[in-house]
């Protein structure tokens, strides 16, 4: 990939289509979540899921924080031909360590402070138990979801945006099938 002398259009569309595809897949499986829960639990289920959504979004954002931040520095160092003294893999390692720390802190916060967090995000006495039941599986996959976001960013910046999109697609399919199995 030669960004200085090559044709930028195919490179741009390769990355654009992968990013757009990932965003669309994420949007679709979020809608499927809401639709299935709404069909099974009704308005209270949808409201409880809306209370849990900010927790999920924060974990997603922490994964993006480590992934995008680390992968941009990784790519910058990789692209600098004059500065080979720093190994770009060090930045990947730092992102992994940072993700482990953030996953552990997030996991501990949600395990020990789940009720106050849900109340902060709008749960009331009628929604709290339902929101807690939706949050239970989230507790189990916090590290996986955070690492998925972090690794997808590194894959994109390591010239493999199609692998990042494939991982998002696999997660989306698992989510839709899991919704059907676990909700109904």
Region spans (language model):
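Short alpha-helical transmembrane segments in multi-pass integral membrane proteins
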Residues: 1-19, 74-143, 177
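Alpha-helical transmembrane segments of multi-pass membrane transporters
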Residues: 110, 163-184
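Residue-level signal for short hydrophobic patches within transmembrane helices
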Residues: 9-28, 55-62, 140, 166
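Small-residue-rich hydrophobic transmembrane alpha-helices
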Residues: 46-108, 145-164
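Extracytoplasmic
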Residues: 18-39, 46
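Helix-loop interface residues and adjacent transmembrane-helix termini in multi-pass membrane transporters
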Residues: 28-31, 40-43, 77, 157-158, ...
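Interfacial/gating helices of multi-pass transporter permease domains
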Residues: 37-57, 126-130
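Transmembrane alpha-helix boundary and packing residues in multipass membrane permease domains
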Residues: 19, 23, 35, 72, ...
């Amino acid at each position: 990939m030669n960004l200085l002398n090559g044709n930028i259009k195919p490179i741009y569309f390769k990355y654009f289509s992968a990013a757009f595809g990932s965003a669309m897949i994420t949007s679709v499986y979020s809608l499927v979540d809401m639709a299935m829960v709404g069909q099974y639990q009704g308005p209270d289920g949808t409201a409880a899921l809306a209370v849990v959504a900010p927790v999920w979004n924060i974990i997603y954002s922490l994964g993006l924080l480590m992934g995008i931040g680390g992968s941009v520095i990784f790519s910058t160092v990789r692209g600098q031909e004059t500065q080979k003294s720093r190994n770009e893999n060090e930045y990947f390692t730092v992102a992994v360590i940072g993700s482990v720390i953030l996953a552990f802190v997030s996991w501990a916060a949600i395990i020990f402070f789940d009720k106050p967090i849900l109340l902060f995000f709008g749960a009331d006495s009628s929604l709290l138990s339902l929101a807690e039941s939706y949050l239970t599986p989230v507790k189990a996959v916090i590290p996986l979801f955070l690492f998925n976001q972090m690794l997808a960013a590194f894959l994109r910046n390591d010239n493999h945006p199609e692998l990042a999109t494939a991982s998002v697609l696999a997660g989306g399919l698992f989510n839709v099938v899991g919704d059907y199995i676990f909700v109904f």
